[in-house]
Amino acid sequence: MTKSTVDEIRERFDADVERFSNLETGQSATMDSALALDLVARTAAAVTPHAKDLLDIGCGAGNFSLKLLSYLPGLSITLNDLSQPMLVRAGERIATQTCGSLARVQADIREWEPGLEKFDVIVAAAVLHHLRTPAEWEATFTKLFNALRPGGGFWIFDLVKHEIPTVQETQWSRYSDYLVDFQGNGYRDKVFAYIEKEDTPAPLTYQLELLRRV
């Protein structure tokens, strides 16, 4: 199957802002979204308690930045997303919650250069599964590692694929059950259809090995 283009992905997210705007539930099509929000924010704050600058890749409507602000008040935040409506909503929600600076960058992370040693914390939540090739994974991880200050942290929450088929089938079955319980068979089919069309998740072990290499 031919995967979605960048423009097609942007258009879908432009029309789906509300689903990404609830801090209590997180992104509802994702299992354990609210738990992940808190775990990432709480752990990032513990690891880098004196963090000043946050980069939120694929920020959506800003949930991860907002949750991090609850643990690290006053952060200066750079928001990055393909979708301008998402960036607008994220900026509106965050601007009143921090005394730090706020920047918004509408760009594909594959094409944007965030700079060298500019951030203490980088978060990439449900975005890296849009990377298509090993070269894109390596280039993106390299630029994000280079954008971290010494002692900084890079935090990922994402859809992953498992190398062992039976494990993949088991986790996919559990995800199916979650979606059906949440909104029924039709919703499950809709989510699975756009994952098939749009996403190219990589195994966790692959990502860890690549992070060590870069």
Spans of model-derived segments:
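Short glycine-centered segments of the SAM/dcSAM-binding site in methyltransferase folds
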Residues: G152-F154
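A short glycine-rich, Lys/Arg-flanked "PGG" loop and its adjoining helix->strand segment in the class I
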Residues: E138-P150
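Conserved class I S-adenosyl-L-methionine
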Residues: M1-T48, K67
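Class I SAM-dependent methyltransferase SAM/SAH-binding core
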Residues: D53-I57, A61-W112
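A conserved beta-strand element that flanks and buttresses the S-adenosyl-L-methionine
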Residues: V123
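C-terminal alpha-helical "lid/dimerization" subdomain adjacent to the S-adenosyl-L-methionine
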Residues: F157-R212
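Short catalytic micro-motifs in class I SAM-dependent methyltransferases
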Residues: A126-H130
